[in-house]
């Protein structure tokens, strides 16, 4: 099992800071120099269309759920902030759905 896979298990709730916008999503600093979080544009909303203009501001904090990762030289943890994915993670933690992240 790789370091990324063992530390950032799918379904884990993590926090980070938005550090860059791209046409395909945002990169998130998750507190580890050699690993970057990535929220792809398709992992923001359950329904409707997300556009880069709607991204959270650079420097803002985000709570997200690990949905995958790369095991190559990119060292990326794929994240989601979709309400349905966050809800499932909060239920696993037995936190009320109204908990702000």
Go through the PLM ranges and name each one.
Residues 1-101:
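Single-stranded RNA-binding regions, centering on S1/OB-family and related RNA-binding modules
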